[in-house]
Amino acid sequence: MRQSLLSATGQSLNLRDNGFNVIVGQRQGKTYEKAVEDGWVPGETLFGIEEACDKATIIMCLLSDAAVMSVWPTMKPYLTAGKALYFSHGFAITWNDRTGVVPPADIDVIMVAPKGSGTSLRSMFLEGRGLNSSFAIYQDATGKAMD
């Protein structure tokens, strides 16, 4: 993952602070302004969702269940062959008949699900602690999903 360009829609500070090559995709508004306050630079590390998804090799969907469903139509066209889609929880993908979140067959789909909120995860990270997580591979199109 360290060699990949990660696009995060949602929580991303821990990735940046751990040295990952990460950009943020946000819609204009409060969350975009918050990202700027957190040090993300428009046009360098902060983009609209479409541009961030287009640039990335791993597209991280780190949003609430409701937000995943609303942003899915925006993200889906950028899930091209060989990319990976990363979730932080499994509702949208597990209940895809209800959410409409059906990834293309030629991408990897993985999940790393912390056992707590993004806020808790960030607080614990800043304290030098971690949080238990579950890991799953939903789809391994490239044979590299475990990497």
Describe each model-derived feature in a short phrase:
Residues G39-E50, G116-S117:
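Glycine-rich, highly charged phosphate/nucleotide-binding loops
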Residues N21-I23, T57-M60, K83-A84, I107-I110, ...:
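Structural motif
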Residues M1-G43:
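NAD(P)+-binding Rossmann beta1-loop-alpha1 motif at the extreme N-terminus of oxidoreductases
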